[in-house]
Curated annotation (Swiss-Prot):
Designated gene of the protein: recR
Keyword tRNA-binding recorded: no
CDD domains in alphabetical order: TOPRIM_recR (cd01025)
Protein name, as recorded: Recombination protein RecR
Zinc finger (C4-type): 57-72
The Toprim domain, residue ranges: 81-176
Keywords: DNA damage, DNA recombination, DNA repair, Metal-binding, Zinc, Zinc-finger
Superkingdom field: Bacteria
Family from the record: Belongs to the RecR family.
Length: 200
């Protein structure tokens, strides 16, 4: 069915969001126009402001509207000596949500993917290399995704860390808590067996 050209444009624009197809976009557009016009206007203003004002932390490259994000600006985070390398700001949020990490981060904004033209320069690895040499980092924790590209990126960075004399580790991968072994795929189970931990 054809709608007004502006409504069609609105629905197409909503489809840039992950998981939003034509039907979801139509439902969102109709909801905003029928019942949530004030909420829609507020959303439009905040989107405009966020897309204009939010940039990257000059130290770790996560999202912030300031020169330094709150984590990098916190001197207690530096005291731990831990630096965790992740692929995206969403990974920072996930790790922070656990409450188990008190160090700092470096956000790659992706992973090595030569076929897509993503090399060390695009990931800011020269900045990371400078940090490894200049800062007092006791351990570099590699928390890239457990994919072929994520593993390749982790190995590349591990070589950099070793060359700088920094201890390096990789987050564990394996069977999820509450998972049943018969339902776990072979690759995950292999990682679990290779990364097993002693019970003390």
């Amino acid at each position: 069915m054809k709608f007004s050209p502006l409504l069609d444009e609105m629905m197409k624009a909503l489809q840039v969001l992950p998981g939003v197809g034509p039907k979801s976009a139509q439902r969102m557009a109709f909801t905003l126009l029928e019942r949530e016009r004030s909420g829609g206007l507020r959303l439009a203003q905040l989107l405009n402001r966020a897309l204009t004002e939010i940039g990257h932390c000059s130290h770790c490259r996560t999202f912030t509207e300031n020169a330094l994000c709150e984590i990098c600006a916190n001197p207690k985070r530096e005291e731990s000596g831990l630096l965790c390398v992740v692929e995206s700001p969403a990974d920072v949020a996930a790790i922070e949500h656990t409450g188990q990490f008190s160090g700092r981060y470096f956000v790659l904004m992706g992973h090595l993917s030569p076929l897509d033209g993503i090399g060390p320069e695009e990931l800011g690895l020269e900045i990371l290399e400078q940090r490894l040499k200049a800062e007092s980092i006791s351990e570099l924790i590699l928390a890239t995704n457990p994919t072929i590209e994520g593993d390749a990126t982790a190995w590349y960075i591990a070589d950099m860390a070793r060359a700088a004399g920094v201890k390096v580790s990789r987050i564990a991968h394996g069977v999820p808590v509450g998972g049943e072994l018969e339902l776990v795929d072979g690759t995950t189970l292999s990682h679990s067996l290779m990364g097993r931990q002693p019970l003390n």
